[in-house]
A protein has these predicted regions:
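A short, flexible low-complexity segment enriched in Lys/Arg and Gly/Pro that occurs
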Residues: 31-68
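Extended polybasic, low-complexity segments that bind anionic RNA or targeting/receptor surfaces
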Residues: 1-46, 91-207
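Glycine/serine-rich anion-binding loops at beta->alpha junctions
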Residues: 54-90
Length: 207
């Protein structure tokens, strides 16, 4: 059973917490994790890319020269794809890149990501992760106290406005809540900073 240290907001260690092995102690399935990350990134795409076909480019309605007798190749429009400033043949058009994974796959990917973080020792549990006021300087001090360098993901059980706003302008720091956690955010962070209550919530859902 994995065990992690528990800290308070001053960075002082207050104890230890045993993590549920069914959630934080499985053998990570990296194939499923890859599928989940690929799915997340695909679903983030706007899909608004667009090019003009020969029918949509302005001009080119008249045949540039007669069909025969000039010695040049026959042409029907100066907006054909082979012309400079012509339309694009088979170019991208607006589309949705969204697709879904099965519940079983998404669940296994989440457990694999959490277990990988636990195995790497990158989970930092905070007892009472909250801010008394909106103060970026104080939140930076908190991160320094727990030695959270690099990219950090801060997870709370519910939206805590003071935490969200205090961390908003800190480069590399993202905030989220336990119910909207996703595999990409977990793996993209160097440190997984989570409220003790949020850990319990995750274990309740996934155990």
């Amino acid at each position: 059973m994995p065990t992690v240290a528990v800290f308070d907001m001053t960075g002082k260690k207050t104890g230890e917490m045993d993590l549920n092995a069914a959630v934080f102690g499985i053998e990570p399935n990296m194939t499923v994790v890859h599928a989940a990350v690929k799915n997340y990134l695909a679903n983030q795409r706007q899909g608004t890319q667009s090019t003009l076909t020969r029918a949509e480019v302005r001009g080119g309605g008249i045949k540039p020269w007669r069909q025969k007798g000039t010695g040049r190749a026959r042409q029907g429009s100066i907006r054909s794809p082979q012309w400079t400033h012509g339309g694009i043949a088979l170019g991208p058009k607006p589309r949705s890149y969204n697709y879904s994974l099965t519940k079983k796959t998404k669940r296994l990917a989440m457990l694999s990501a959490l277990s990988a973080k636990a195995a790497a020792g990158e989970i930092i549990v905070i007892d009472g992760l909250d801010m008394g006021e909106i103060k970026t300087k104080n939140f930076v001090g908190f991160l320094n106290a727990i030695e959270a360098t690099g990219k950090s993901l801060v997870v709370t059980p519910e939206v805590r406005v003071n935490v969200v706003k205090s961390a908003a302008n800190i480069p590399g720091v993202r905030t989220t809540i336990a119910s909207t956690l996703n595999v990409y955010e977990i793996l993209n962070a160097d440190k997984f900073i989570i409220d003790k209550a949020a850990i319990e919530k995750l274990q309740e859902v996934y155990a």
